[in-house]
Amino acid sequence: MENLNALSGNQNLEVWQLRLYVAGQTPKSVTAFINLKKICEEYLNGQYQIEIIDLTQQPELAIEDSILALPTLVRKLPEPIKKIIGDLSNTEKVLVGLQILPSMDWKI
């Protein structure tokens, strides 16, 4: 398990706790991490913590968040818990799925 912290000195802002479940360092897992890191850097202003959980090393941890597919991103905080499956390459879907940006489903 690897912890990657990017916390700024300003602790007044809410820290996003994100957990990325992967199965080793496959191309899809690496892509998911790169995409997640890019999104966090751009939209969360350094107020995030990413925890990488490799289920090939710790398969029992999949039970805690009911992980059925990989890679899976779990937003632990802020609540409610949210999950996104895949390589996180569609930035807009990730932003909406994590509720960083509101859904733009409506048409004018």
Swiss-Prot record:
Q: Name the GO terms of the biological process aspect.
A: rhythmic process
Q: Which Pfam families match?
A: KaiB
Q: Which Gene3D superfamilies match?
A: Glutaredoxin
Q: Which InterPro entries does the record match to this protein?
A: KaiB-like (IPR039022), KaiB_domain (IPR011649), Thioredoxin-like_sf (IPR036249)
Q: What happens when the gene is disrupted?
A: A kaiB2-kaiC2 deletion mutant cannot be made.
> Record's family?
Belongs to the KaiB family.
As for what it does, the entry says:
An paralog of KaiB1, the major clock oscillator protein in this species. A metamorphic protein which may reversibly switch between an inactive tetrameric fold and a rare thioredoxin-like monomeric fold (KaiB(fs)).
Listed name of the protein = Circadian clock protein KaiB2
